[in-house]
Swiss-Prot record:
GO terms for molecular function: ATP binding; tRNA dimethylallyltransferase activity. This is tRNA dimethylallyltransferase. It comes from Chloroflexus aggregans (strain MD-66 / DSM 9485). The gene is miaA. Gene3D superfamilies: 1.10.20.140, P-loop containing nucleotide triphosphate hydrolases (3.40.50.300). PANTHER family: TRNA DIMETHYLALLYLTRANSFERASE. The keyword Nucleus does not apply. The lineage of its organism: Bacteria, Bacillati, Chloroflexota, Chloroflexia, Chloroflexales. It catalyses: adenosine(37) in tRNA + dimethylallyl diphosphate = N(6)-dimethylallyladenosine(37) in tRNA + diphosphate. Catalyzes the transfer of a dimethylallyl group onto the adenine at position 37 in tRNAs that read codons beginning with uridine, leading to the formation of N6-(dimethylallyl)adenosine (i(6)A).
């Protein structure tokens, strides 16, 4: 069975540094598993690998969509599996690298993802239900037709509740049944990079300061000037939506930066919950001899 190395971990843990150094040593190529780095024109806020880093090792699934374009989990899975197969066919080693839990699980666990395209009118109708009757009402609808999915998805995650209802209403099949898994066509070695949470928070805060110094606020302004609306999934993502009050004149920049810190810390906690459920994890801390040797 073909080899795959997966490097997972929360934001700011050091995935990119390790992945690039390791890829150089083993003739590897990096397949990004980051739901924000797929977007062009969004470089600073997504902590996208720099041009220098991308030149040191081939990268895949970065800068493949414009900010207004949709990108589903099924599309990611298809493109990631194709990239992995292509890399292996050329005798190179694929490294799946990222912190988006669903992206990682879809590839590593062999998720069977419903190929139901987005239904804008249906989504708008369901969004109105959530808005006027509350997320709990929408979640109750899901529980009535797919209790397994409802048990997995919290009522507060309106986007996933809507997707589950959309799949059922279009296909007539519960999304939980359509998401049954089969073994992937490779043998993954999954490495979870782990640091103490206080250290992660400090590293994330320092990176936010670097982002601000590098022009993150200007990047957001340029996206808005280009016609990209806050309602887009890309613009509502971490690193961008936190600046909406600043650009709408309802908060100062310092307040928005503090909100970005707070939301990033919360995101780190959610990421760690995802990684714990991945199978066959090797946990590496910064003093792990292999981690130290690779980046030396």
């Amino acid at each position: 069975m073909n080899e795959l190395i997966a490097i997972v971990g929360p934001t700011a843990v050091g995935k990119t540094e390790l992945a690039v150094a390791w890829a150089q040593r083993i003739n590897g190529e990096i397949v990004s598993a980051d739901s924000r780095q797929i977007y062009r024109k969004m470089n600073i806020g997504t902590a996208k690998p720099s041009a220098t880093e991308q030149a040191l090792a081939p990268h895949h699934l970065i800068d493949i969509r414009d900010p207004e374009q949709s990108f589903s989990l099924a599309e990611f899975q298809d493109l990631a599996l194709a990239a992995i197969a292509d890399i292996q066919a050329r005798g190179h080693v694929p490294l799946l690298v990222g912190g988006t839990g669903q992206y990682l699980a879809a590839v590593l666990e062999g998720w069977q993802i419903p190929r139901v395209p987005p239904q804008p009118e249906l989504r708008a109708e369901l969004e109105q239900v959530a808005l006027h009757e509350g997320p709990a009402t929408l979640h109750a609808r899901l529980a009535a037709v797919d209790p397994v999915a409802a048990a997995r998805i919290p009522p507060t995650n309106v986007r996933r509740v809507i997707r589950a209802l959309e799949v059922y209403l279009v296909s007539g099949e519960p999304i939980s049944r359509l998401q049954e898994r089969q073994p992937p066509p490779f043998r993954p070695r999954t490495i979870w990079l782990h640091r103490p949470r206080t250290e992660l928070y400090a590293r994330a805060d320092a990176r936010i300061e670097r982002m601000i110094a590098a022009g993150l606020v200007d990047e957001v302004a340029e996206l808005l000037a280009g016609g990209y609306d806050w309602s887009l999934p890309a613009m509502s993502s971490l690193g961008y939506i936190q600046f909406r009050p600043y650009f709408e004149g309802t908060a100062d920049l310092t307040t928005c930066i503090e909100r970005l810190r707070f939301d990033t810390h919360a995101f780190i906690r959610r990421q760690e919950m995802w990684f714990r459920r991945l199978p066959n994890l090797e946990i590496w801390t910064p003093d792990h001899p292999d981690w130290r040797a690779i980046i030396a």
